[in-house]
């Protein structure tokens, strides 16, 4: 049973507040963590420039109590931890973050917001939005066994586990002609280069463990995937930058794989993506908030949405199809995004009643 004593909140002097930037790492990294050596050094610097004191907090499950003590002294925490990492999940961390949030420490992104926004289920919940497509959700392997064959008959599908990162649990699936009375499929793991052929039932067995995360998502394969994926970075409800990448994941053609490369980052002013920016800021993010019952203040300080190209409209403009939303550990980021994050942190800290009152006293 965790202590029920209230957490302390830092007292503002000439500064706006004190926060942590938290990421996962081993004991060596924890002992040697500094602002200057951190991969988040630009975020630390941007926060300092706006009057926010930030410190590194390196997390692992076996130092949970020490991390709790660190967070107890602070006003908030920005969290960069993937859902899955070397076989470990976020279960213990999420419990800690819920605890500190209940005791007045601001958490971004809150685990409950991650569950709403940062899992593949959001693709099904928002499928009727104009970024959506023919998206199915399976709660059990039996439901998947019953419904997937009919969808495969219409074309290749992409199967996605509800929680994961780095392409883990993502498969392109195509139906094969039945030769021995058993349906077979051709599957391509997003983390691998070569497809394999297997009985459908064997593939379903592989997917059985995914249902521990609550569901499996099924979307049509987007034929224009080889043209690239556009990542729209969001700071709260405002666009903060873009990344464009020719990907290898789920791509089989050697020529297309040969053109794949690193993600190229640009500012929010990139003229190629201004239509996408307007859609995200003016239409899709408000609709997302309404669909998920989220307030503006609930939105993560940094999150992103990955878009593939769908069909073209009658006027020739590209339609964007949402592939996933990333909330848990959005990094690396375009250079300009650090300042956007810092400004959203300032806005959030100023909205806290205790800090707002302290700031008023200082300004007097």
Which residues make up each language-model segment?
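Active-site nucleotide/adenylate-binding loops and adjacent lid/helix of ATP-dependent enzymes
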Residues: 12-23, 98-104, 110-217, 226-227
